[in-house]
Amino acid sequence: MKVSEFYQKFSSDCTAGSASQVLTRNEVSVDVTGRCYYRLSHGGENYALLFTNQIDSTFSDGSLSVANDVGGTWELHSVRVGICSRKPDGSYTEPELFHTLTFNGKTTRTVSGSEPFCTDPFPLHAKAGDSICYEISLTGACYPYHQEIVLPTFRLADGEWIPFKQFPVPVMIGSDREVSLRVGFIGDSITQGCGTEVDSYTHWVARIAAGLPDAYSVWDLGIGYARGYDAATDKGWLARAKMCDIVNVCFGVNDLLRGRTADQIIADLYTIVNSIHKAGKRVILFTVPPFDIMGEAQTYWYRVNAKIRGVLGETADAVFDFASVLGQPAPNEYRSVYEPHPNAAGCQIAADAYLAKKFF
């Protein structure tokens, strides 16, 4: 199936952030079989998975991977998906039935280059709240993975499944259920939900999704360490966000921490908003979240947020004042009441405030 067809027929049915964050840098090819578990938001009859071999945004200091880096050539031997159940101890049952997925009719694929790719549709007949086990087997030296994924991930080693993150994961779990609105959230670890417990789905994007009509789909494109200036390059990551009808944009923290000035951040946000509008989509622009930012960066934090609340925000379709919702009272507005990466309590408060605005 072509990616263009994927976007026509499929929309996100999982609110967990799942991305291409870092490239492995193995000296020689390695064999890996990995598993990751996802919870489905609404269920559906047919599904397909979307992948990319290109890094979405710069990881940490950039020494391992920067935005738009492309993975090497690697062999994808198999991808399987099956419905399973989460046990009280947090582990998962073995799926009774695994579906072996295909890529243009073939069960294997040689992956190379920067173009996204997807599986063919497969029947799943899933219900809302069902969990799925995603399993991939591959051989390669340089391929993407999600280091800060907030989902349970494992590798098969000597017959045992051990915690492990270094294997590719889908950037969307797509369902062909009928939806009336596609809502996307692009941002950093705060958007991804890195301050919440693994596999809890208590991050604010998930809590917003829970309060929206069932006919809406929600796609969390948040990634740890992400920068607005990477999204402003207008490559694969922002291109995915622009497949949504409404794009929520939440950047600034990592830009400030990496030395970006207020004027640079403002210019990047203008670029992002304009690009989304050129695609014919709506934008909800967030103020820069509260964080433990000191020195000159703190001054820039106030300047950028003043601009977002003013003329910059006027270029968007709406503004959500995230900073005011989670920030401390003056003079410490730049610090969060609910930890720098919002915990579950803070995420629920943010979600409630967002839903109360009735943006759409």
What positions do the PLM features span?
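N-terminal secretory targeting modules
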Residues: 1-186, 191-192, 196-198
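Conserved acidic residues
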Residues: 130, 245, 317
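Hydrophobic positions in alpha-helices of CheY-like receiver
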Residues: 272-276
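Catalytic His-Asp segment of secreted/periplasmic serine-dependent ester chemistry enzymes
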Residues: 290-360
